[in-house]
Amino acid sequence: MKKIFIAISAALVSMGAYAQDAQQAAAEAAKALEAAPEAEVKVEKPKYWEESLKTNVTIGQTSLTNWAAGGDNTVSMAAYIDGNANWKKGDMFWNNRLQLDYGFLWASSKPIIQKSTDRIYLESKWGYKAPSTRYLYFSANYDFKSQFTTGYEYKTPSVEGLEDMDRQEQINHWKDARVLKSGFLAPAYTNLALGIDFVPNKWFSLNFAPVTGDLVIVNNESLRGAYSMPLKKQYEGMAEGVPTDGSQFSSVRFGFGAQLKMDAKVNINDNFSYSTQVVLFANYLDIKHCPRINWDNRIDWKLAKYFSFTITTNLIYDDTIMIADKNGENPKARVQFKESMAFGFTYTIASKK
């Protein structure tokens, strides 16, 4: 019995010592945890900007040798840039877009390089969500349109023996026969529109701006008459002594009216997209003219990682622009239409969402 009592006592003593050591270790661990620095929790900053840059370069070439059906050897090249920078925070947004488009064409039948496409388009829109609405925004919209370089219509020179002349002489005759059609800021269109934006989803928006200031700029005197620029005040009412070289017209025409703009972009899938923009402007100060219409369409079909097929169309109707027929006669308002198809290299840079 004595041995059993001694064994039990020894076990109790050892258990007590073990419990004391465990309590001491737990206390030390708790102190260590309290003294340890707290781990930093990284809070991701809100992202308000989304940027993208799309570039496209197309090259075309045709070579004919002893081709019975005839034709021209041609070389063409065009470049397109579409940059977007959009900001959104809460009920406010600010969207910015810049499109640059330029191309040229050389054909063996003409010893000159011709411009095939030329466009500058800048748009900036600010909007603030209207109270107690879901899709309506108060908005201010600014845009600017023009082109980089002078554009000509190249008519065949009426000179005998043109084909037998040396290249420089041919070039000089072609330049003498060309007709100036446009240039940088000739024309240029810019306006500021205040109104309401209807944005039901990410791919569609409709803007109505009943307060729109519009400026048409033609800095080349010889083109002002074709764009119906207003007569300068010093020549108003004069029957004689009025210049006829275009200097009698002002370089700026101001309009005040209403604008309706519709934008839509539909991505059918990751490789196929369609975008369109329609803009109508009616001038309160000149109601005898029809509303100015601009309608642009673009189809992008991505064939491979860096290659795409593109179709673009541009339609313009402006009855203040006088366009002559093929013979250079009967100038009047006409529907302007341009269509192009291109296959080329495409590269897109976009910010991560």
Model-derived segments and spans:
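Sec-dependent signal peptide cleavage junction
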Residues: 17-54, 353
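Residues on the lipid-exposed face of transmembrane beta-strands in outer-membrane beta-barrel proteins
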Residues: 53, 57-59, 79-87, 122-128, ...
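Transmembrane beta-strands of outer-membrane beta-barrel pores
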Residues: 57-63, 89-91, 100-106, 142-152, ...
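Surface-exposed strand-loop-strand hairpins of Gram-negative outer-membrane beta-barrel proteins
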Residues: 60-80, 108-112
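Residues that define the transmembrane beta-barrel architecture of outer-membrane proteins
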Residues: 73-79, 116-122, 186-190, 252-258, ...
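Repeated loop/turn-to-beta-strand initiation elements of outer-membrane beta-barrel proteins
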Residues: 92-94, 133-136, 203-206, 271-274, ...
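Outer-membrane pore/translocation modules
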Residues: 115-255
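Outer-membrane beta-barrel "beta-signal"
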Residues: 336-353
